[in-house]
């Protein structure tokens, strides 16, 4: 029975020994401090990853926005060039029409000149 009492007392003595060796709970404070540093580091890494993701997304948005603006600008310039080409084509069509008028005018003028010469020859 005595050994039972001693056994029951030993853990208490261990607690007393631990309490005596660390009366201010420095070991627990160190563990808590290390855990706090770990949590801070973990939170910083989490914030860093989120910040990096946000920056990458913003960068993509800016790049796509800039690229879209450049593409839209190029499309606008291409449309302007196509409009100018259409205008030139209309001018060429007008020139072709004028050429047709000139060719028909020349043939009619030759006919008029021929008739006039015949008329003059008949008057002589």
From Swiss-Prot:
Where is coiled-coil annotated?
75-98
GO cellular component terms attached to this protein's record: BLOC-1 complex; cytoplasm
Query: Which terms under GO biological process does the entry name?
Result: endosome organization
For this UniProt record, the keywords arranged alphabetically read as follows: Coiled coil, Cytoplasm, Transport
Q: Which InterPro entries match?
A: CNL1
Q: Is Cytoplasm a UniProt keyword of this protein?
A: yes
* Region Disordered: start-end pairs: 1-20
**Localization, UniProt:** Cytoplasm
Describe the subunit structure: Component of the biogenesis of lysosome-related organelles complex-1 (BLOC-1).
UniProt cross-references to PANTHER family, sorted A to Z: BIOGENESIS OF LYSOSOME-RELATED ORGANELLES COMPLEX 1 SUBUNIT CNL1
Described purpose of this protein according to its UniProt entry: Component of the biogenesis of lysosome-related organelles complex-1 (BLOC-1), a complex that is involved in endosomal cargo sorting.
Hey, which family's this protein in? Answer: Belongs to the BLOC1S4 family.
Task: List the protein's name.
Answer: Biogenesis of lysosome-related organelles complex 1 subunit CNL1
The organism is Kluyveromyces lactis (strain ATCC 8585 / CBS 2359 / DSM 70799 / NBRC 1267 / NRRL Y-1140 / WM37) (Yeast)
- The gene that this protein is the product of is CLN1
């Amino acid at each position: 029975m005595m050994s039972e009492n001693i056994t029951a007392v030993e853990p208490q003595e261990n607690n007393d020994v631990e309490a005596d060796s660390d009366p201010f709970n420095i070991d627990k404070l160190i563990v808590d401090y290390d855990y706090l540093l770990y949590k801070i580091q973990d939170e910083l890494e989490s914030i860093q990853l989120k910040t990096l993701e946000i920056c990458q997304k913003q960068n993509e948005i800016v790049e796509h926005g800039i690229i879209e603006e450049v593409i839209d600008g190029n499309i606008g310039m291409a449309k302007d060039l196509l409009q100018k080409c259409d205008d030139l084509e209309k001018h060429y069509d007008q020139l072709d029409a004028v050429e047709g008028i000139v060719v028909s005018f020349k043939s009619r003028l030759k006919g008029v000149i021929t008739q006039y010469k015949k008329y003059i020859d008949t008057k002589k």
